[in-house]
Amino acid sequence: MQPVPAAVRNWLIVVAGMIFFMIVLGALTRLTESGLSMVEWKPVTGWLPPVGEQAWQAELEKYLSSPQGRLVNRGFDIDQFKQIFWLEFLHRLWGRLIGLAVALPLAWFWLSGRLSPWLKPRLVALLVLGGLQGALGWAMVASGLVDRPSVSHYRLAAHLLLAVALYAYTVWLVLELGRQDLRHDDAKTMRKATALIALTFVVMTWGALMAGLRAGASHNTFPTMSGYWMPPGLLELAPWWINLFENGTTVQFVHRWLAAFLVLGVLVLAWRARRPEALAAGAMAVVQLGLGIATILTGVSIALATLHQAGAVLLLTILTVVRHRATASRPRPLSAMVAG
């Protein structure tokens, strides 16, 4: 068989970029509390927004009957409703476009014989997981349509982590189809990068829990938390371990210290590896730390919090490159490689 065309790799680069934008858009949707503005899930027929004043009024009435509409925004008029509706609509629309951007080229490349046996199941997995991500997104929204005007912070974390995992998986496929001569066999760096990638996901988990609990606004000082290194109330819930997930103060405390260990670990990796991609990871870790501190000090500014989430994904991207390049190149059939 012939090598996989460069068009396949370019397609996956576009998909990765679309997922990255989706993660940023999701952050904006959450921070502006727009995610509960659409109270129905229409995966097939939901491509078009309301058309005409009557349709908009009907959509507003549905929203006002939801917990958020009744308890938080009960005085909303059409114009105020549109401000939160459009962001959630764009978020859902972009998800559908990602689905098409994966499914249609996948079918074309498959039927035209341009995909290798090595790549086919991996791309099918990407498509299936993308569909599951859409369903998980609705499950998250549905949790805020029952009796409280907010979504489950557990489902919020799961939704974000799956999106980030899909992005990282796509980036890995791009790297696998790229230049293999950039690789160098460095088992120590590979193991450290693997551990730091895992820690990045853990830090992002507590960041998502922090966002879902709105815990970022509870302590807006740094390096202490309202003047305390160990703020009161860390273990006020019983059993004690539930504080790690449901106590806003504890969740912020854990997120801060996990992030500190992550930044320290990345800086050590950069200092020891001394390679361009490792140094870039170190620089990005410092930037991300600065964004996190600024987000806290500003009481969770929407712009800074969005950049902070984007920064986490960029750090993960660079660490993925570090790990890939530190992994010894494995022999692979010619059909798994990119031509050009």
Could you describe each region identified by the protein language model?
Residues M1-G340:
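Polytopic transmembrane helical bundles with strong interfacial aromatic enrichment
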